[in-house]
Structures are given as C-alpha cells and as structure tokens.
Amino acid sequence: MQKRVFNVLLVASRYDAFIMEEDGRVEEQIYFEYVSLNLSSPPRVKQVTTNEEAFEELAMKRYDLIITMPGVDCSETFTQAKAMKRLYPYIPIVVLTPFSHEVSRRIAKEDLSGVDYVFSWLGNVDLLVAIIKLIEDKMNAEVDITSVGVQLILLVEDSIRFYSSILPHLYNFVLKQSQIFSTEALNEHERMLRMRGRPKVMLARTYEEAMQIYEKYSGNMLGIISDVSFIRAGVKDKKAGIKFCSYVRSCDPYLPLIIESSEWENHKDAIRLNASFLDKNSKKLPVDLRKTILKNFGFGDFTFINPHTGEPIVTIKNLKDLQDNIDIIPDESLYYHASRNHISR
C-alpha cells in the first residue's frame, strides 16, 4: 500500500462538530479505533467550521481527504464541493450527512459530480475508519491488486444508509481476520506486511461501476456482496443485482457470491446462482454477513471435506498443520478444493 491518508480536513458546523465529539475529539476516537485494530499511522484531523476556512487550509497544507457535513442548505455543500474538486481534483471528497428520509430525498436531487462518496453519519466512529480505508483501498487498487496480487471484496450497493451501516462491519471483520493471519509472521516487519496485504474492499453503486471493477480485477476477486435493486443504464432496475451476478457466475462458476435483499422472493435467484442469500430486514444482518463471509470467502481455519458426503476430514490452522496432515488428505478432496480455488483464497 503505497498511498495513505495522513491528513483529513473535516468541514462541519459547530453544532455538527459537537454532535460528532460527544464521545471525545474525532482525532482521538480515530486513534483509539486504529489502536484496537492494530493499525499503524492514524491520520491527523483538522476541523474547520466554514468553507472559507476550508479553502484557506487547502491553500496552506496538503490534505489527503476532505470530509464535509452539510448544514441547513444541502445544495451549498455540493456547490462548494464542486469548487474544491475543480481546484484540487486529486483529493477525494466525502459528504457525511445525518440520516433522515428528507435528507435522502434532497440528496437524490443534487449534482454529485463534485463528491466521491456520500455517507450517512450514524453516530459511530467506525464509519470514519471505514471511509479512510475505503479511500486508501481505491487509491492503491491498481498497484496492489494488479501488480502484487492482493485480493478484492466487491460490495455492490446504492443505499447510502445501508452501505454506511455495513461497511464498518465489513472492514472490522477483514482487519481482525488479518490480525489473526499476521500472528503467524516471523517478525514485526513480516507481520506489518501481512496486515497491509489484507483483501481490499471496493464499493460500486451502479451496474456499470460494478461491471467495470469486476472486468478489471476478476482474476483477484475474493468474493462479491451484491444488492438486487440499483441503477442500471441510468434507471432503477429491480433485478440489476441478479443480472450482474448471473454474468459473474457465467464467467466464474465457483466465485463466492452473497446476494442481500429486503425482498424474500429474491432468494430463489440466489439458489439458482449458487449464491448465499441474506435478508436485509434481519436485525442480525451484521452477524449473518460475518458468518457467511467466514464460511465462503476463505477466512479462518481451512477444513478439507469429503466431496461426496460433505463430512469434514481434517481442519488446517496454518502451514505447519498442512505439512503434518497432507498424507491423510484424500486426492479427491484435495482436487475438489483446488479446482474450486478454495485453497488459493
């Protein structure tokens, strides 16, 4: 990972800043979250309360990410974001809004060309860490995935509130699994390399965006989590996710797919595509998602099974375990897992 987010400019009114800092200063909250996840180099956060102050800061200092919170006038925020993007096209800009149906309706009518992402602030600093990691993953995807061979998890979702809720859970899971994997490292340097070699996470909000990412990185795709209804060819398509997953399945019969939807009838398509199905209405969706990823995306211990009965043969925790047990693993089990890319995950 060559590019990192070191300096964040947060543009928020005094009221919004007060709401965000109920549990302490934003920079301190991010620092403690980084420490809990065993991450290095937490970013520094500079807070300003007006757009004028923001432009002054940008003129004096280099920033790697701009997060802006709209006040009463939502349109003004997006207008100023476009002005910032014209002057600093290389800086990602994220709009962080309080969630309400009224705000969602207003955002749907706005010109979003000046912003990279819109997120809903749900009161948890986990979201800020997820935003920073999402930006870093996007900045480093070209080199880390194409040249180094790092794997990718693709989330396809257009609901601002939903991806704002699920991304922190997804990153928390991936980072903690990487922590477990890094404990096998021989030294501190190798441990850090393993942490930085974790799977990338990328977010697509339209059919075309999902197709572009898949076509570019299909050889390194670890798994896909997709909604069903989102924009395709400029209009809302209630089956866009099914069409996308059908294309993916025609290219790769074994890639793990998770289809999530608030409409139960879509589970029939998931069965047809040999994909897992998650109900977005479930109160334990984050737990269900974590269990499904752990089971299907190759995290955790590896269990060789009998391909005919599904019964477990042996569970492998590390390379030493594999060396010790390779002789008792039947050829047909080894072939079953290898031919489906289970081992390479």
Model-derived regions: residue spans:
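Amphipathic alpha-helical packing elements
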Residues: Y335-R345
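Non-catalytic signal-transmission and effector/linker regions of two-component phosphorelay proteins
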Residues: M1-K46, K82, E110-Y117, W121-K200, ...
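Hydrophobic/aromatic residues positioned on beta-strands within the core alpha/beta folds
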Residues: L96-P98, I259-E260, K280
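Conserved phosphotransfer microenvironments
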Residues: I19-V26, S40-P42, Q47-A59, Y63-I93, ...
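Short, charged/polar "capping" segments at the starts of alpha-helices
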Residues: A17-M20, H101-R105, Y163-S164, E265-K268
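As written
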Residues: I107-V118, D269-L278
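Polyanion-binding and phosphate-handling cores
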Residues: I242, S246-D252, E265-F297
